[in-house]
Amino acid sequence: MTRRYWNINLEEMMEAGVHFGHGTRKWNPRMAPYISAKRKGIHITNLTRTARFLSEACDLLFDAASRGKQFLIVGTKNKAADLVASAAIRARCHYVNKKWLGGMSTNWSTTETRLHKFRDLRAEQKTARLARLPKRDAAMLKRQLSHLQTYLGGIKYMTRLPDIVIIVDQQEEYTAIRECVTLGIPMICLIDTNCDPDLADISIPANDDAIASIRLILNKLVSAICEGRSSYIRNR
């Protein structure tokens, strides 16, 4: 895998608060190699290491995208939800930003059935067929469609399991992580100072609570995907 330059700036990361971790009492000792200091009861992440692993993640994503691979971005907490959706749409990735439904990947056949139902209901809505049904039936199907849109809207075009999954918050997305581990799907994960760096293939030490921090990391990752996709299109 060729190493590339991704314009990862330490000063920019500091301005975004990427280096701020959790309180020193709320930490995972396995994160010790990624912590540079303690300040006012808060652990400070070593941004040099953040830059290194972020660069490695960008290289991996570029390489995968340039070979036509598919990606899934997962981030369901309120602070991350909108950022995840906009980043995924920009890079034409699948995403989950409301709730990870248990078995979404490990029980893929059930997820596929739900997706087929979702697509059918969307088609019926677009052709105004729902409007021609009895009110009670139409209301029930509209509720069902709304539910499916909330939880499956970001993966509505997904026809197979993703090649790489990007996780925004390890603590919040443990079920998704466990399913990826079970299936052997490679993961890139943002890890704060209370996380386990050994769960993902590439762990990026960063503040996973600040919106500016999440936005910066996601922007770098999806930029790599976009560049990789452009390379894939040029070389087809």
UniProtKB/Swiss-Prot annotation:
Official protein name in the record: Small ribosomal subunit protein uS2c
Principal location: plastid
Similarity annotation: Belongs to the universal ribosomal protein uS2 family.
Alphabetized UniProt keyword annotations: Chloroplast, Plastid, Ribonucleoprotein, Ribosomal protein
Gene Ontology molecular-function annotations: structural constituent of ribosome
Gene: rps2
Cellular localisation: Plastid, Chloroplast
Protein's organism: Buxus microphylla
Record-level GO cellular component terms: chloroplast; mitochondrial small ribosomal subunit
Record GO biological process: translation
InterPro entries, per the entry: Ribosomal_uS2, Ribosomal_uS2_bac/mit/plastid, Ribosomal_uS2_CS, Ribosomal_uS2_flav_dom_sf
Presence of keyword Hydrolase: no
